[in-house]
UniProtKB/Swiss-Prot annotation:
Keyword check for Lipid metabolism: no
Function: Catalyzes the reduction of the macrocycle of cobalt-precorrin-6A to cobalt-precorrin-6B.
Disulfide bonds: none
PROSITE patterns per record: COBK_CBIJ
InterPro entries on file: Precorrin-6x_reduct
Keywords noted in UniProt: Cobalamin biosynthesis, NAD, Oxidoreductase
Pathway(s) per entry: Cofactor biosynthesis; adenosylcobalamin biosynthesis; cob(II)yrinate a,c-diamide from sirohydrochlorin (anaerobic route): step 7/10
Protein name according to UniProt: Cobalt-precorrin-6A reductase
Originating gene: cbiJ
UniProt cross-references to NCBIfam families, sorted A to Z: precor6x_red, PRK08057.1-4
Swiss-Prot/TrEMBL catalytic activity: Co-precorrin-6B + NAD(+) = Co-precorrin-6A + NADH + H(+)
One Pfam family matching this protein: CbiJ
Primary enzyme class: oxidoreductase
EC number: 1.3.1.106
Amino acid sequence: MVDSLATVWLIGGTVDSRAVAEGLIAQGINCLVTVTTSEAKHLYPIHQCLTVHVGALTPQEIPKFLKRHSIAVIVDASHPFAAQITTTVTAIAKEQQIPYIRFERPPLALGKNTLEVPDIQSLTRGKYQPYLRGKRVLLTVGARWLSHFSLLQDEAVLFARILPYPQALAQAIAAGFTSDRIIALRPPVAEPLEKALWQQWQIQGVVTKASGAQGGELVKQKVAEALGVNLIRIARPQTIPGQITDDLSQINQFCQRHLPS
């Protein structure tokens, strides 16, 4: 029997993290989920074993957080591109000898019209930049990354799809996007809407992250193939070697094995 005070810290904010949380609470395991926005809180079911903390944690706050909440196991189900939090937590878990496991679905196979680039710099400043020059390009990389494309505003017709938040809009405008080249949509975006948007803007290329099917990448692959549009996928950042799985049952077993009884 698991110690009733022992808690699993689930780094969440993703659809995958909801599945992880549901698996843990089904076993009666106390689960504390952290998310960075109040909207993400609604991903999770209401349950006596589940608590959701809203707000980002700094590296300095995490050790106190672990102690205050009696964290015995850490499950990282953050976004594949949330490399900073993964790197930070991995180091702290090792230092404090807290069992750590990461849940991450494998990347999708490359589609027929998909080109993968190693990082955003190779696309905006490196050898893949010609794929953007002179083209009508839709950027679906998140508002925080739009500044990387600022210097290309005079070399391509760039459009940005962002989340419907004031901060995201401010970041897009600061990166040089005018109101007629910005659309705010909350995912998931259905295939017909995705296709209609690309056609409306006469898109010739789309830049996305390798976020997997849950991140809408599969829909983009289908639309790219249907319309003959080039899809440029930014590869996931390299993860620190360690415990990682895409099997929910392994997450459950890991927690059961490492939680004190």
